[in-house]
């Protein structure tokens, strides 16, 4: 996904086994440098970890005056040769 005249977003893939604190650090790092990031998750467990990570990352970037918004959408991904529907969470600075 690209914005108007913007380069493609950096994509972070989250699994059910991902640690939210680690993902939050990655999200905060990309947000600080690029102002936006896409988080992809397939399955309820992965979506849960991704949402927790986004909430944690808000706490990491808020002290420097950055407020995050999250825009969810569906995405079709190919995983091991199979089409899967996942969730795309676009995280941007408001």
Where are these regions (language model features)?
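Short, hydrophobic/π-rich interface segment
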Residues: 44-68
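Flexible, active-site-adjacent loop/turn segments at secondary-structure boundaries
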Residues: 12, 40, 59
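An N-terminal amphipathic alpha-helical segment
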Residues: 4-35
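C-terminal edge-of-domain segments
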Residues: 62-94
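Short glycine-rich, basic-tinged beta-strand/loop micro-motifs
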Residues: 30-48
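Residues that cap or initiate secondary-structure elements
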Residues: 18-20, 45, 76
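Generic structural hydrophobic/aromatic packing signal, biased to beta-strands
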Residues: 12-14, 27, 50, 54, ...
